């Protein structure tokens, strides 16, 4: 092995002082002498050392063995004290046999640090023993060159220290002067300073006096040229080992600015930039966060330029810099590593809030692109482990900053998508905030904001939920598709980008169309399956019923038949009993009439006879109870001095409206009785009403016999099932009975309200068969009458007789068929001579219920829960609401009887019914008439107020058609005739996408050409007679080439193209309308609040109306605003409803929000939408037919130049799919609409009702909102008025406590206070005070009289206050 020092080279991995190999100067320093006790310096040096340490074997810089100058070697100290004192011969050719001695000497040489340091210490350990001896010999021989041998090592060291101090002092003497001047002196001074600064003794002397460091920073810095940058930076890197120098450099703003500007200087050497970054990195650890702040303040100014320059460095080719840098790859690795270390150090030096701002600034400058490039470039490089670690650290720091800030903002745990992935399903993440924070101040911030705004518009738009869901699914699918399928390379070429863009465009359009169609078909299929399930459930229910009917055995049917036969026989017997009862009733009536005519006595005698008759009946154990009751009533009636007119039964609501049924039949009978004595008739009427028999008159018996008894039985059964009084409207027999004013007692409403129940007593009587009645008593003598009058006490104990027993027909089955009793004796005349019976004493008991056995199988069955739902009756006359009632409430919302009951209870408990009675009561007719007269008078008073070449060419078209050609084809005027024709035949996008041109091609004049026009163009089309088409004008030429030559299929072609160009727009318009209707239907089906509102409105209306309805139609909602209050004409029934709902039922008030989507349906006609859907379907079917079997089905029938089939064959299938989807959607929507209409009591078969189904909802919502606004404004005005009034009262009370003079001034102020407040409230310039100033003058006079002792002062003041209050109230109402 050649050991010549001139030929051998060394592998030296570290950067040398010189920028080029030929100019390198030896470098040395003593690491063991550095002050490593400073923790900050140690951390910084350790961080830099780790980052720049080489990993494994890599490239090395091969340098010559002659690496140090003579000056460096001559000034080096002794390597070893032991070696210096020995007489060993350091001959390179004669190596000692003791290898351990060579190793020890070489280790001492390395530990000295004068000649080798840093990575050289590690690398030189691996060289051979022979090589180590050569280095020792070279250094030892140089050390003894030209010097005398020192006898003692101590003496030598003393001389060496003395020389070193002298040399340092001599160098410092001229250092300030040399550093302040430029040129060669500055260059020599810097190089020499860099060498001296490696010595600890010189470093202490240099820093002992601040003038040296100040001169180096302030005076030398402006003089630094490009050649001196590296040595200048090396000086500061050595100075950074001292804490005082670090602090001084950190607080020198010009120095820090020079370091940062050097990073962006593209003319400077990269090694200088790398060294500058290392110095900035070291300074970020000084004084905690202060160092980071000072460094970032200067670095942020030039960070954008620096990052761009760094990107250029990473993108440049290696061959470009091979001539300047020996190892370009290693330099890029070192540069990138230091860059990442500096960024991470800055982020770690701030708190999270400031770090977030810095991170957003870095994002804005596209630092993520740079990091992504580094990650891709050095992902598999074994020498770039530090880079990958720093990238990972940057990402983790970024995530930590985002997580901490989001946690602080939202008070939640880790919300960043990259953290806590396992908790995504269990905890909702605030992805929107995280996304915005992550994209803030970056290039992607604007696109992400646009995407979020688009998503917000989708959610906030009026689109139905189904449409919004499809759009969101589409967006999500597209994003996943694009992310997975279109990954763009790191640096794609322009051609690759263009090609990928074209592929994306094609695939994107096709994917979007397919995805939309699949989403729509899925929605329709889902709804169709739901509809099928409902129908299957109904079919299974019907099958169960059918099976139940079929499974009935014959024995069961025979048993039912036997029961029916027994019921028929029983009813036959009952009919016979009724006939016998009619005969008995007729006979009894004759007796009563005869008795009435024979015994015509005065009232006093009749009273005595009644008392005696009552006592006789009382003594008889088998007497009738009716006479006892009559005696009691007679004793009570004697206390009344004047007779009172009783209320007739005909006055009742039921009988009054029903008695007119037989009015015409009874006129003849009534006319025969007009000649009789009126007094007798009145007495007879009172007598019969007192007896309380429901007996028809003799004159009506014949009419009653002609009426079937089944009608009576069915009606009585109906009343019995309802538990109420029988309805006499449906029975002409009962109506005829009730129409007789002489036989029916007068029924008082008070007696009914008092709840006098006679039915139980009457029902119990027939249980024991009564004995035969006693014979009619003779008329009493006059003496007995006088004696009876003299003993009122004895008469008072006689009770009035009870009603007669019921006929056998009305007894229960337990009584059996008992023969009717004999008729009762005729009553004495005195019984009919009562003196004005009271209204409270005359009671007609209701008809007793029929026995269960008499119920007819054909009788009407009514749900008792429905008929019992009545609001409490009211005595006041209220305004009526004209309902459009629903007769059949089955399967409608009105079928919910439970909610109806709850609604009535709540309205009654909250006092809503009482408020209705006060607000909507009927006014008296006189007031209404006066008001109408006043209004009519007011109304009457108010009623009294071409070029020359074109002209030479031939044209057969009409002027109008030629002008239309020019107008519609003006955008293609630059094209020639044939160019335009070929554009049409090629189906160019400019033609196909222009709807106006396609519509023009479909005009009648162009598709249906008359024969006369064909004859004119025939020579040109066939080329006969030598006529050339060039002789025709432009419009005629186009007309000839297209409309005439292609007339066989031109009509079909034009209509097909027009359909294909417009079908998508029409499809989405119709789908949008249908989905709006679906959305409205779903809201109406899912709104329990609106259902509750309907029940409240109905029950309040039932309380006001005379007739109760089970349900109302939707049209009735619009009539609520026409029912005005009797107190204030500005208040309608709808105002009242709105206030009640808002105050009493705030949870129901949200129905307005539930139905807000219905407001948009006012412009949509259901019939029109349905017809458009069918028309669209038919149009697409015709299109498909044309291309399958029509004129456009075969290419040989078309012009060879025509490309229509190739252009539209894919669009036809798509149009057919959309047509089927649309018609399916339309059918499902109509099915749901029919169900909803039936639910609200509407007829789905009525076209008018279907078209206007949503209109009542829209109008009602508009009126309801208007009423709500007016109510709130009125309440606010009243609140302001009450505040002003309370303020006035407080001031008045305070003024009364003051003295007299102050009292006068206070009253004047109070009088003006309200007027001033009113004027401010109305905000008018003209003050309405002069009108009341006159009143104020009078008030002042009254106030003066108060001091004079007037007694009426208080009343006058109250009167004045009342007047002023009314005036203020009028002003507020005018507002």
Curated annotation (Swiss-Prot):
Coiled coil feature spans: 520-601
Lineage per the UniProt record: Eukaryota, Fungi, Dikarya, Ascomycota, Saccharomycotina
Function in brief: May organize microtubules by mediating spindle positioning and movement in the budding process. Potential target of the RHO family members.
PROSITE patterns for this protein: DAD (PS51231), FH2 (PS51444), GBD_FH3 (PS51232)
Modification sites for Phosphoserine: 621, 751
InterPro entries: Actin_filament_regulator (IPR051661), ARM-like (IPR011989), ARM-type_fold (IPR016024), DAD_dom (IPR014767), FH2_Formin (IPR015425), FH2_Formin_sf (IPR042201), GBD/FH3_dom (IPR014768), GTPase-bd (IPR010473)
Residue stretches making up the FH1 domain: 659-851
CC terms in the record's Gene Ontology section: cell division site; cellular bud neck; cytosol; mating projection tip; mitotic actomyosin contractile ring
Protein's name in the database: BNI1-related protein 1
């Amino acid at each position: 092995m050649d050991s010549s020092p001139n030929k051998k080279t060394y592998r030296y991995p570290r950067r040398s002082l010189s920028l080029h190999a030929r100019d390198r100067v030896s470098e040395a320093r003593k690491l063991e002498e550095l002050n490593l006790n400073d923790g900050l310096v140690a951390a910084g040096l350790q961080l830099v050392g780790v980052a720049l340490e080489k990993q494994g074997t890599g490239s090395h810089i091969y340098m010559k063995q002659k690496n140090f100058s003579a000056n460096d070697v001559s000034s080096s100290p002794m390597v070893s004290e032991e070696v210096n004192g020995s007489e060993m011969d350091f001959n390179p050719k004669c190596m000692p046999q003791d290898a351990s001695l060579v190793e020890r000497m070489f280790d001492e040489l390395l530990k000295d640090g004068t000649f080798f340091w840093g990575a050289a210490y590690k690398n030189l350990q691996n060289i051979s023993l022979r090589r180590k001896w050569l280095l020792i010999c070279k250094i030892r021989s140089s050390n003894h060159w030209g010097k005398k041998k020192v006898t003692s090592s101590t003496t030598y060291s003393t001389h060496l220290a003395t020389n070193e101090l002298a040399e340092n002092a001599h160098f410092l003497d001229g250092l300030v002067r040399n550093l302040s001047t430029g040129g060669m002196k500055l260059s020599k001074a810097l190089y020499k300073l860099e060498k001296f600064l490696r010595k600890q003794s010189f470093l202490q002397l240099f820093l002992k006096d601040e003038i040296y460091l100040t001169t180096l920073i302030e005076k030398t810095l402006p003089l630094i040229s490009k050649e001196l940058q590296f040595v200048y930076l090396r000086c500061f890197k050595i100075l950074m080992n001292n804490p005082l120098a670090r602090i001084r450099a950190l607080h020198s703003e010009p120095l820090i600015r020079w370091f940062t500007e050097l990073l962006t200087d593209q003319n400077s050497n990269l090694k200088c930039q790398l060294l500058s970054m290392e110095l900035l990195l070291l300074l970020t650890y000084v004084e905690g966060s202060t160092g980071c702040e000072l460094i970032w303040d200067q670095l942020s100014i030039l960070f954008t330029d620096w990052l761009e320059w760094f990107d250029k460095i990473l993108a440049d080719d290696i061959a470009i810099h091979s001539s300047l840098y020996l190892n370009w790859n290693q330099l890029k690795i070192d540069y990138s590593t230091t860059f990442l270390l500096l960024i991470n150090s800055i982020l770690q030096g701030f708190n999270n809030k400031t770090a977030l701002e810095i991170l957003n600034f870095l994002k804005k400058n596209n630092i993520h692109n740079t990091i992504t490039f580094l990650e891709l470039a050095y992902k598999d490089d074994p020498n770039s482990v530090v880079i990958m670690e720093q990238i990972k650290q940057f990402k983790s720091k970024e995530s930590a900053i985002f997580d901490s800030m989001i946690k602080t903002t939202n008070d939640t745990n880790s919300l960043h998508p990259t953290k806590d992935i396992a908790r995504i399903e269990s905890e909702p993440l605030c992805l929107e905030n995280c996304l915005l924070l992550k994209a803030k101040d970056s290039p992607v911030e604007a696109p992400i904001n646009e995407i979020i705004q688009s998503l917000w518009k989708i959610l906030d738009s009026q689109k139905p939920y189904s449409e919004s869901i499809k759009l969101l699914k589409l967006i999500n699918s597209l994003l996943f598709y694009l992310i997975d399928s279109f990954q763009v390379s790191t640096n794609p070429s322009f051609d690759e980008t263009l090609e990928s863009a074209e592929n994306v465009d094609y695939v994107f359009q096709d994917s979007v169309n397919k995805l939309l169609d699949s989403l729509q078909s899925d929605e329709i299929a889902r709804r169709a399956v739901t509809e099928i399930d409902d129908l299957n459930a109904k079919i299974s229910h019907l099958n169960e019923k059918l099976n139940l009917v079929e499974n009935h055995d014959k024995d069961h049917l025979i048993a039912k038949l036997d029961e029916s036969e027994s019921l028929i026989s029983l009813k036959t017997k009952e009919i016979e009993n009724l006939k016998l009862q009619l005969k008995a009733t007729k006979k009894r009536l004759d007796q009563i009439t005869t008795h009435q005519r024979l015994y015509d006595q005065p009232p006093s005698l009749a009273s005595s006879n009644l008392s005696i008759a009552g006592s006789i009946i009382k003594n008889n154990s088998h007497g009738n109870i009716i006479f006892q009751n009559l005696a009691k009533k007679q004793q009570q009636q004697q206390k009344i001095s004047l007779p009172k007119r009783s209320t007739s039964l005909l006055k009742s609501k039921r009988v009054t409206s029903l008695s007119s049924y037989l009015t015409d039949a009874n006129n003849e009978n009534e006319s025969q009785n007009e000649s009789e004595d009126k007094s007798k008739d009145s007495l007879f009427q009172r007598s019969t009403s007192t007896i309380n028999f429901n007996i028809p008159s003799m004159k009506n018996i014949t009419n009653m016999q002609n009426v079937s008894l089944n009608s009576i039985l069915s009606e009585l059964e109906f009343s019995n099932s309802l538990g109420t009084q029988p309805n006499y409207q449906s029975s002409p027999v009962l109506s005829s009975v009730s129409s007789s004013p002489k036989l029916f007692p007068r029924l008082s409403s008070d007696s009914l309200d008092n709840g006098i129940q006679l039915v139980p007593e009457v029902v119990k009587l027939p249980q024991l068969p009564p004995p035969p009645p006693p014979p009619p008593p003779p008329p009493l003598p006059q003496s007995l009458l006088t004696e009876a009058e003299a003993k009122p006490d004895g008469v008072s104990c006689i009770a009035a007789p009870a009603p007669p027993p019921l006929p056998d027909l009305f007894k229960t089955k337990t009584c059996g068929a008992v023969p009717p009793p004999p008729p009762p004796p005729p009553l004495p005349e005195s019984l009919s001579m009562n003196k004005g019976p009271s209204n409270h004493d005359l009671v007609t008991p209701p008809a007793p219920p029929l026995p269960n056995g008499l119920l007819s199988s054909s009788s009407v069955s009514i749900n008792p829960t429905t008929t019992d739902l009545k609001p409490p009756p009211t005595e006041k006359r209220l305004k009526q609401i004209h309902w459009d009632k629903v007769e059949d409430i089955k399967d409608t919302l009105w079928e919910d009887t439970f909610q109806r009951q709850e609604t009535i209870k709540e309205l009654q408990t909250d006092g809503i019914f009482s408020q209705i009675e006060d607000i909507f009561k009927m006014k008296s007719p006189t007031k209404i008439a006066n008001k109408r007269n006043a209004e009519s008078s007011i109304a009457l008073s108010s009623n009294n107020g071409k070029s020359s070449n074109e002209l030479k060419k031939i044209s057969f078209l009409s002027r109008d058609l030629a002008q239309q050609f020019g107008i519609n084809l003006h955008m293609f005027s630059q094209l020639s005739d044939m160019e335009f024709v070929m554009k049409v035949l090629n189906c160019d996008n400019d033609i196909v996408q222009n709807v106006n041109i396609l519509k023009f091609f479909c005009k009648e004049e162009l598709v249906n050409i008359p024969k006369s026009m064909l004859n004119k163009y025939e020579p040109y089309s066939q080329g006969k007679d030598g006529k050339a088409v060039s002789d025709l004008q432009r419009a005629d030429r186009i007309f000839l080439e297209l409309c005439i030559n292609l007339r066989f299929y031109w009509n079909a072609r034009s209509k097909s193209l027009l359909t294909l160009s417009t079908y998508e727009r029409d499809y989405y318009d119709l789908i949008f309308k249908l989905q709006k209707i679906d959305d409205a239907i779903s809201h109406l089906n899912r709104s329990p609040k609106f259902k509750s509102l309907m029940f409240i409105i109905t029950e309040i209306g039932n309380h006001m109306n005379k007739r109760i309805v089970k349900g109302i139609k939707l049209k009735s909602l619009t009539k609520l605003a026409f029912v005005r209050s009797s107190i204030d004409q500005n208040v309608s029934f709808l105002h009242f409803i709105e206030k009640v709902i808002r105050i009493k039922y705030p949870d129901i008030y949200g129905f307005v929000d539930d139905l807000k989507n219905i407001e948009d349906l006012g412009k949509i006609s259901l019939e029109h939408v349905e017809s458009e859907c069918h028309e669209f379907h038919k149009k697409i079917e015709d299109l498909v037919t044309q291309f399958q079997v029509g004129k456009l089905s075969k290419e040989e029938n078309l012009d060879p130049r025509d490309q229509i089939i190739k252009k539209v064959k894919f669009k036809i299938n798509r149009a057919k799919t959309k047509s089927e989807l649309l018609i399916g959607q339309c059918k499902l929507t109509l099915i749901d609409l029919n169900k909803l209409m039936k639910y609200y009591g509407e007829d789905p078969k009525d076209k008018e009702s279907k078209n206007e189904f949503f209109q009542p909802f829209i109008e009602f919502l508009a009126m309801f909102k208007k009423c709500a606004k007016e109510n709130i404004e009125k309440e606010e005005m009243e609140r302001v008025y009450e505040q002003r009034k309370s303020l006035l009262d407080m001031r008045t009370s305070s003024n009364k406590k003051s003295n007299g003079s102050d009292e006068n001034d206070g009253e004047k102020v109070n009088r003006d206070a309200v007027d001033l407040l009113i004027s401010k409230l109305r905000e008018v310039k003209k003050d309405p005070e002069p009108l009341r100033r006159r009143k104020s003058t009078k008030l002042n006079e009254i106030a003066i009289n108060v001091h004079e002792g007037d007694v009426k002062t208080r009343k006058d003041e109250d009167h004045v206050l009342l007047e002023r209050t009314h005036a203020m109230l009028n002003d507020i109402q005018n507002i």
